[in-house]
From Swiss-Prot:
The active site is at residue 739. It catalyses: DNA(n) + a 2'-deoxyribonucleoside 5'-triphosphate = DNA(n+1) + diphosphate; Endonucleolytic cleavage to 5'-phosphomonoester; dUTP + H2O = dUMP + diphosphate + H(+). This is Gag-Pro-Pol polyprotein. Residues 119-128 have a biased composition (Pro residues). The RT polymerase active site binds 2 magnesium ions. It comes from Sheep pulmonary adenomatosis virus (Jaagsiekte sheep retrovirus). Keywords: Aspartyl protease, DNA integration, DNA recombination, DNA-binding, DNA-directed DNA polymerase, Endonuclease, Hydrolase, Lipoprotein, Magnesium, Metal-binding, Multifunctional enzyme, Myristate, Nuclease, Nucleotidyltransferase, Protease, Repeat, RNA-binding, RNA-directed DNA polymerase, Transferase, Viral genome integration, Viral matrix protein, Viral nucleoprotein, Virion, Virus entry into host cell, Zinc, Zinc-finger. Belongs to the retroviral Pol polyprotein family. Mg(2+) 2 binds at residues 1322, 1351, 1371, 1436. Mg(2+) 1 binds at residues 976, 1051-1052. The lineage of its organism: Viruses, Riboviria, Pararnavirae, Artverviricota, Revtraviricetes. Zn(2+) binds at residues 1455, 1459, 1483, 1486. Residues 1665-1714 bind DNA.
Length: 1726
């Protein structure tokens, strides 16, 4: 075959042989295949012949090449070609013979006996699979036929391309089905007779394409095939026979591979026995055990669609493993799809994973044959990447040697179990050696202990061969005779054997094995071995060394490059090294390592050898082959790689010092499962950071004396010398003896400095002797040793003590260990590296050196590394802000013995879990326990007092998320965090505030005190801190996957996405971030399949509903019971169709007494309402939102109140208004506007967008009317971008409200009606109702005491009296507003029975009217002309003149309203002084405000706006407007006041501007010396308005006497009118304005003028009286002079010879002439 013609002949022979079997292959591909064979097997062309043995040898060489170089170096069709050719050469295949015998045994299908049940033929294929027979008349020439063969080779490439991924021949039973057609042809070629019926096994190609011809563009359809067979295949008959035998079909009933029979495909179930064995293998040995992988490889030969692989994995794997498999399966399919796209293969990603348009199983039958092979290959690769199961560690740990079991039998059982679990033989042997010692019985362990790290399994078996029952019996007898334990006898025998071995010199030579001499003098040591060369790898022509090769061409004649250094011999090749470490054991440095990428922060490190880690081994030290020192100025931080953490390898972080020169090692453990670490596997990384040196250092280098940041403690042998240690105590050095028996250290008095204080100790000191009243240090002393350990202690001082004693108070802080020869301690020391009779040491030389760090999980042994740490961040909750640092101590109340025992158990449990810690805190809160229904106790703490001292955080999630917002058709994963509060640590500074005490009965012992380290139950901020902590942990996932729909509420997390692959990828990353923050996912609560239980909902694929609630009605007895029931109903109401009118009977039950314990009974209507609720719960169907389609807000016109629903094919969320309306009267369209606004708000809140359209129950004309006349309607649609419609879909769910009567305003008009009847109405509080109809007056006396109610009565009478159209006017705006809305008000919300009755009667009359009406408002007491004003005035007078029979009644009515004084009443109503006084005295309010007159002189103005006094008074009941600024015109006493929020300058200026707008500008303004009046801004203001401003005497209020009395008058008037006022709403502005009205307009002087009349009225020209007056300064009398003002206690006199008037006290004035009617004169009201 070395010649060209022979190679062409060989290619032609292979082509003909394959074509004869129905397989057309391109000659070009065969030539390329043979070229690759020649490259891999250089000896193959020289053999000259090809037989089955030679071809199998070629296959082995191909597999070896594949293993060494990977799939990239092997063409994709190589294994397929090799398999096809192997089948052609193998005529004696056992499988072929077995199948032939099986076929021969079948009966002739034409003569099937009656006993055999008939078998229905498989169903016909879908239309896309049907083939059309080709035209048999076509004929081709030889040239055309050759071209067609070449094209057919390309066409049939997919038929056998799937074999490219197979590693071996398809010879197992499970692979028989997929290769059925190939084997059939092979049987025929081998001469085996098949049944004669051609329909059963047609001689057709084994894999006809079953897809439509249009799949491959540009190719003609293949030739047709005969009709399908009606008989079963052997596999089908085997399945039917198994079913007839009663085999139970397992969970694999959905696993159906695709078979091809002629030109049809059908879908047939796999043998359930095969799948059942697979499931058992997964549960017993694990999904990645070799036995399980072999079954998966066998299953992979079937043409399984994606759905079958998913179903198989779901049935065999656990929930977590299934998620991992599915995620990896999707990744593998994505890679294959990328390759297919590049090569033009039309097998897409959706086809491979079975999603999208290929989700249904029927559509998966149309795939190309090669697609099934790719799917199976991806599924197998994903299965192989599953992690090893942690439960298999327990299985291995259970394989233990029995007391009487031979050791070799035990090892055989162990090897058999490991072989089924582990595929790596080398790693399995390492594990077997370890378990062969650990799981052996005590006798074998004692014999193997000295050799456990030196010998192998064969040595172990040889050593323990003689250990049996007789051996153990002899050991027991020896122990009994010596009085020792069996273990001590075994140790004694071991030590004796060790000494004997050392003394004897009969051991053989280590080189040649012969006895009598040592290896150093062995004659064979220096003899060199002679090696013979094999085939030259360079020229492949002969057997010689490559360095000696002189050939210039290879065996095929190709030129070869020259050999460099042909005459010289180069150095031997070094060990293989890697960029991230050393796997060959050579010494490497940090400088030899390379970073993975340019941006890599750390240097990767790997293990140098195979290592097996088990949970029982604890932490192990792994060598890296990399040595220090680090680069100058740096220090190394050793961390684990994330990929290693995902595989279950825990890398413990450590610090590599800058001066460390030893080998850098990795501390690794496998806490959960068995882990195999291969040589060269990257598991850790070294991060170099700058070295910062602060403080003092010891002047020595670490070199290679220790690994990590600190050395192990030195172990010192006990000798005759005392174990002394020098300490530095408070800057002084002391040397002392280590005393492990001393509880506390003692310093000799002769070494005690005289300047250090000391005191008498309270307790005695006992030891060998006893010392009473010893001395002790008065203060804590700080000690420090030379290794840097430090601490504080309070030593005793004893006289006559020769040496200082360092007790356990110091030794415990130093971490000193004791070593004793007990068996327990010996076991620990042996694990740390101790050799018997040699002491400790790394090199087993007996030299005392620091031990290698090999800590165990139980923290026993020498040198403890912090096992609890890993390379995860230390996180805790945010610190809490506190109002005070004052400790809060609440005494613990006593507990009964039962509760105390329960509390102690719960506290110990929390202490063991690390949730609490011992405490000495100054805070204390009591604890108590309660027993749950299950019988378990629960620990609670009363933190109410502590909660009062903290700043409360706001709620981060004020509402519950709705599942409706989850995108429709999404894949969902729901997880629950386990004990979320208890996994979140408190801020360290906050722990002390949550301390508690555990009491004891009868104070038998001090209380044990603890404090919480995690979020405690009952703390106000615990929910908020929990939410924020979890939100921070999952924030990176939200940022990395912005399209992921992630819902987090407390400890529940939901993930949803339409891409399942991305969902599982995000879930995997989410678990990592939660784990890094210390949050634990409850594995049993991971939900990956429908239905999901989430936040009280049950989520199904297309809908969800609330979990069914059973309404309990037997306990409904009080108001509190009904309140709780309606609270629960209100929570689920947004997900139920429950209109307000359905629940109204239950709402009515809540009315009445507000006492929570007040009795309530369930009415018949209430029971009906509860039945409606239960029916709504049963029929609920809420769907998910499809954001790609339109959805909207529908307003349903239900009775009493409208109902809203966000709707998309089905309801998304129901919307209801409050059962208690905000106003007493609201029209129906106003309620519709309210629910529209609420619906828009909830759409944005829950779905993040406005509803695309809103459907309202109003036509377009009605909508126009609402936009014109309803403000709330316009506000509801403000800035709405969507569409408004009134067309409802034909859905029964939305049509249920259409039958209800819905009212729109029809009778009440907004505009007056032309030529209608004119009506005026009025009502008075005296119960008189007046009615004027077309100038005819009517009145009636009612029992109502409210004017508005009386007016409603009058309106009702008008509606009953006038049936035709009318226009009604009234002066009550309240009545008019109510009448314009009452027609469409569904619910009258007033609580007054009188008003409710009248409104109901008016509404009923309006609903029955035929003619429209108009209700208008007209202002009362208007001076405008016109008939409307006159008509209203007539109705108003009609309500008064009928009952005002005298002026006294009128005065009494006026006083009841305004509370004037008696003088004003006498002048206003012309009644006697005594009658007026009696009215005031009979008032229930006014007598308490009588004031006595105060006499004094205060300057007054001589005309209006001459002199003002301004001040500020405070009225607290006005709230923020309590600052009342008051100004008074001193001439007329006219008052001006305004309300402000302060009394600064700007408020004073605002008040004066208000006064100027009504009264003008004064000439002079007098104020006090307050800062608001003395500021520069106020002075500039007065100057701008040309006002002369002056102030009084500081701190003397008499200068402001007039305005001060005005303050009192205003306050008294406000108190008078405070009670029983129904004229207006009680606002501060209304009250103050009313008081000013009474004081300015209704308070009259002696002349009958009010302050307003005196201020704005005309000046009187009457003659001024003359008086004589006395000057108080000169005591001289002057006059007579005219009097300008004569007030109460003061007189203003204008001397004739003066320029200005004088103010004189009234007692210094005498009349010069008699005044007219002086006897009837009265003082000014002031």
């Amino acid at each position: 075959m070395g010649h060209t013609h022979s190679r062409q002949l060989f290619v032609h022979m292979l082509s003909v042989m394959l074509k004869h079997r129905g397989i057309t292959v391109s000659k070009t591909k065969l030539i390329n295949f043979l070229s690759f064979i020649e490259e891999v097997c250089p000896w193959f062309p020289r053999e000259g012949t090809v037989n089955l043995e030679t071809w199998k040898k070629v296959g082995e060489q191909i597999r070896t090449h594949y293993t060494l170089h990977g799939p990239e170096k092997v063409p994709v069709e190589t294994l397929s070609f090799w398999t096809l050719i192997r089948d052609c050469l193998d005529f004696d295949n056992d499988e072929l013979k077995r199948l032939g015998n099986l076929l021969k045994q079948e009966e002739d299908p034409l003569h099937t006996p009656d006993s055999v049940p008939s078998y229905d033929p498989p169903p016909p294929p879908p239309p896309s699979l049907k083939m059309h027979p080709s035209d048999n008349d076509d004929s081709l020439s030889s040239t055309d036929e050759a071209e067609l063969d070449e094209e057919a080779a390309k066409y049939h490439q997919e038929d056998w391309g799937f074999l490219a991924q197979e590693k071996g021949a398809l010879t197992s039973k499970d692979e028989l089905v997929e290769c059925f057609k190939n084997l059939t042809i092979a049987l025929q070629n081998a001469g085996i007779q098949l049944p004669s019926n051609n329909n059963t096994f047609p001689s057709a190609p084994p894999f006809p394409p079953a897809y439509t011809p249009t799949v491959m563009a540009g190719l003609d359809p293949p030739p047709g095939f005969p009709p399908p067979s009606k008989h079963m295949s052997p596999l089908q008959k085997a399945l039917r026979q198994a079913q007839r035998l009663g085999e139970v079909v397992s969970d694999f009933s959905l696993a159906f591979p695709v078979f091809e029979n002629n030109n049809q495909r059908y879908y047939e179930s796999l043998p359930f026995k095969q799948l059942k064995e697979l499931k058992i293998a997964c549960s017993q040995y694990g999904p990645t055990a070799p036995f399980t992988i072999a079954m998966i490889e066998s299953l992979g030969t079937q043409a399984l669609p994606p759905n079958d692989w998913k179903q198989t994995a779901r049935a065999c794997l656990s929930g977590g493993d299934y998620l991992l498999w599915k995620s990896e399966f999707f990744e593998q399919c994505a890679r294959i799809a990328d390759v297919n796209r590049q090569q033009g293969i039309q097998t897409s990603y959706e086809m491979l994973i079975g999603e999208g348009p290929y989700q249904a199983t029927d559509t998966q039958l149309n795939f190309l044959p090669g697609a099934y092979a790719q799917i199976s290959n991806a599924a197998r690769q994903a299965w192989k990447k599953l992690p090893s199961s942690s439960t298999k560690t327990e299985d291995l740990s259970k394989v233990r040697q029995g007391p009487d079991e031979p050791y070799q039998d035990f090892v055989a059982r162990l090897l058999d179990t490991i072989g089924k679990i582990m595929s790596d033989e080398k790693a399995g042997m390492v594990l077997a050696k370890q378990l062969a010692f650990e799981n052996a019985n005590s006798a074998c362990q004692a014999a193997l202990r000295p050799y456990r790290k030196k010998g192998d399994l064969s040595d172990f078996i040889r050593i323990c061969a003689d250990i049996g029952p007789s051996y153990m019996q002899g050991i027991a007898m020896a122990a009994a005779l010596q009085g020792k334990s069996i273990k001590e006898v075994l140790f004694q025998q071991q030590a004796r054997n060790k000494k004997g071995l050392q003394k004897s010199g009969n051991s053989g030579c280590f080189v040649c094995g012969q006895p009598g001499h040592r290896a150093a003098v062995c004659p064979q040591k220096h003899q060199t071995s002679v090696n013979t060369p094999n085939l030259c790898p360079r020229c492949k022509k002969g057997k010689h060394w490559a360095r000696d090769c002189r050939s210039k061409t290879d065996v095929q004649g190709n030129p070869l490059p020259p050999v460099s250094g042909n005459l010289g011999e180069g150095p031997a090749p070094g060990p293989e090294t890697m960029l991230w470490g050393n796997t060959a054991g050579s010494k490497r440095t940090i400088a030899d390592l390379c970073r993975a990428t340019r941006g890599s922060a750390g240097l990767d490190l790997c293990a140098t050898s195979y290592t097996v880690l088990t949970p029982e081994m604890g932490v192990q030290t792994l060598a890296t082959g990399v040595f220090g020192p680090l680069p100058p100025g740096t220090v190394g931080l050793l961390l684990g790689r994330s990929s290693a953490s995902l595989k279950g390898i825990l890398i413990h972080p450590g610090v590599i010092d800058s001066d460390y020169t030893g080998e850098i090692k990795i501390l690794a453990s496998a806490p959960n499962k068995i882990i195999v670490i291969n040589a060269g596997q990257r598991i850790a990384q070294l991060l170099l950071v700058p070295l910062v040196i602060q403080g003092k250092t010891i002047n020595r280098d670490r070199q290679d004396k220790g690994f990590g940041s600190s050395d192990a403690y030195w172990v010192q042998n006990v000798t005759e010398a005392r174990p002394e240690l020098e300490l530095r105590i408070n800057a002084n050095f002391f040397r002392g003896v280590l005393d492990t028996g001393a509880d506390i250290s003692v310093i000799s008095d002769k070494y005690w400095p005289t300047t250090w204080p000391k005191q008498m100790a309270i307790s005695t000191l006992q030891g060998i002797g006893q010392t009473t009243n010893p001395e002790q240090s008065s203060s804590l002393l700080t000690w420090k040793d030379k290794d840097g350990h430090t601490g504080q202690f309070k030593p005793y001082i004893l006289p006559y003590l020769p040496v200082n004693l360092w007790g356990r108070d110091i030794l415990s802080k130093m971490g000193v260990y004791l070593y004793s020869p007990s068996p327990t301690v010996t076991d620990l020391m042996l694990d740390q590296g101790l050799l018997p009779n040699q002491g400790l040491g790394k090199q087993h030389q007996g030299i005392i050196l620091p031990l290698d760090l090999k800590p165990n999980q139980d923290r026993k042994g020498l040198g403890c590394f912090p096992l609890g740490t890993s390379d995860s961040p230390v996180t805790h909750a945010d610190p809490i802000d506190w109002k005070s640092e004052e400790p809060v101590w609440v005494d613990q109340w006593p507990l009964t013995q039962e509760k105390l025992s329960a509390a102690q158990q719960l506290v110990q449990e929390q202490l063991r879990l690390g949730h609490i810690e011992p405490s000495t805190s100054a805070w204390n809160s009591p604890i108590f326990v309660i027993k749950k229904k299950s019988g378990k106790w629960r620990l609670l703490q009363d933190l109410r007092k502590v909660n009062e001292t903290m700043m409360h955080m706001g709620a981060l999630q004020p509402g519950l998320p709705t599942p409706s917002a989850i995108p429709d058709k999404s894949y969902i994963i729901v997880i629950d965090l386990k004990d979320c509060f208890y996994t979140i640590p408190l801020a360290p500074q906050d722990c002390k505030r949550f301390a508690f005490s555990l009491p004891s009965v009868n104070f038998k012992e001090p209380m044990q005190r603890y404090q919480w380290r995690v979020l405690p139950q009952g703390m106000t901020n615990s929910p908020t801190l929990c939410q924020k902590f979890v939100a921070t942990a999952i924030a990176p996932v939200r940022q990395r996957f912005p399209q992921l729909y992630l819902v987090h509420y407390m400890d529940d997390i939901l993930l949803a996405h339409t891409d399942e692959h991305l969902l599982y990828q995000a879930f995997s990353i989410l678990k990592q971030h939660l784990s890094l923050n210390g949050l634990v996912i409850a594995d049993e609560k991971i939900q990956t399949h429908f239905p999901y239980n989430y936040l009280g909902f049950s989520l199904y694929p297309r809908v969800y509903n609330t979990q069914l609630v059973k309404l309990q009605t037997d306990h409904l007895k009080t108001l509190n019971d009904f309140q709780k029931l309606l609270g629960d109903i209100n929570w689920i109401r947004p997900y139920l169709k429950l209109p307000t009118y359905t629940l109204q009977p239950l709402f009515d039950i809540l009315k009445g007494d507000s006492d929570p314990a007040s009795p309530r009974t369930l009415s018949l209507e209430g029971r009906t309402a509860l039945q409606s609720i239960e029916e709504a719960i049963r029929q609920q169907q809420i769907t998910y939102c499809d954001y790609q389609r339109s959805w909207g807000l529908y307003i349903l016109p239900t009775p009493r109140a409208p109902t809203g629903v966000l709707y998309q094919d089905k309801p998304l969320r129901w919307i209801y208004l409050s059962a208690t309306p905000t106003k007493h009267l609201l029209p129906y369209y106003e309620l519709v506007a309210k629910i529209i606004a609420k619906g828009r708000h909830e759409a944005i809140q829950y779905f993040g967008m406005e509803p695309p359209f809103i459907c309202v129950p109003y036509a377009l004309e009605q909508q126009d009317w609402l936009f014109q006349f309803s403000d709330n309607w316009s506000i509801a649609f403000a800035n709405y971008p969507g569409q408004i419609t009134h067309h409802y879909p034909s859905d029964k769910l939305l049509q249920f409200a259409s039958s209800h009567a819905f009212i729109f305003p029809k009778i009440v008009r907004r505009q007056p009606i032309p030529e209608a009847t004119l009506i005026f109405t009025d009502g008075s509080s005296n119960g008189t109702a007046a009615l004027i109809i077309n100038h005819q007056t009517y009145y009636a006396q009612t029992s109502f005491s409210s004017a508005q109610v009386v007016e409603l009565f009058a309106v009702h009478q008008a509606l009953l009296t006038v049936p035709t159209s009318f226009n009604l006017f009234t002066d009550s705006s309240y009545v008019v507003g109510a009448l314009q809305m009452i027609e469409t008000v569904p619910i009258i919300g007033t609580t007054s029975p009188e008003v409710l009755n009248l409104f109901t009667l008016i509404q009923q009359v309006l609903h029955c009217r035929q003619h429209p009406c108009f209700f208008g408002h007209i202002r009362a007491h208007s001076t405008l002309p016109g008939a409307l004003v006159q008509g209203n005035h007539t109705a108003d007078v009609l309500t008064k003149q009928v009952f005002f029979q005298s002026a006294i009644d009128a005065a009494r009515k006026s006083h009841d309203l305004h509370h004037q004084n008696s003088h004003s009443l006498r002048l206003q109503f012309k009644i006697s002084r005594e009658a007026a006084r009696q009215i005031v005295k009979s008032c229930s309010t006014c007598p308490q405000f009588f004031v006595l007159p105060q006499y004094g002189v205060n300057p007054r103005g001589l005309r209006p706006n001459h002199l003002w006094q301004t001040d500020v008074t405070h009225i607290p009941q006005f709230g923020r407007l309590k600052y009342v600024h008051v100004s008074i015109d001193t001439f007329s006493n006219f008052l001006m006041a305004s309300l402000h929020t302060g009394e600064s300058t700007r408020h004073c200026i605002q008040h004066l501007l208000f006064c100027f707008s009504t009264s003008g500008i004064p000439q002079t303004l007098k104020t006090d010396n307050g800062p608001g009046y003395t500021s520069r801004s106020f002075q500039r203001f007065c100057l701008s308005f040309q006002i002369h401003h002056k102030t009084g005497i500081p701190y003397n209020p008499q200068g402001q006497g007039i305005v001060e009395r005005a303050h009192q008058r205003i306050k008294h008037q406000l108190l008078k009118q405070k009670k029983g006022n129904e004229l207006y709403s009680p606002s501060p502005h209304n009250a103050l304005n009313h008081a000013l009205y009474v004081l300015n307009f209704l308070t009259l002087d002696t002349e009958g003028n009010s302050a307003a009349q005196r201020f704005w009225g005309e000046r009187s020209s009457c003659k001024k009286p003359l008086v004589r007056w006395k000057d108080p300064l000169t005591n001289l009398w002057y006059g007579p002079d005219p009097v300008l003002i004569w007030g109460r206690g003061h007189v203003c006199v204008f001397p004739q010879d003066a320029e200005a008037p004088r103010w004189i006290p009234e007692r210094l004035v005498r009349a010069a002439e008699e005044l007219p009617d002086a006897s009837d004169a009265t003082h000014d009201p002031e």
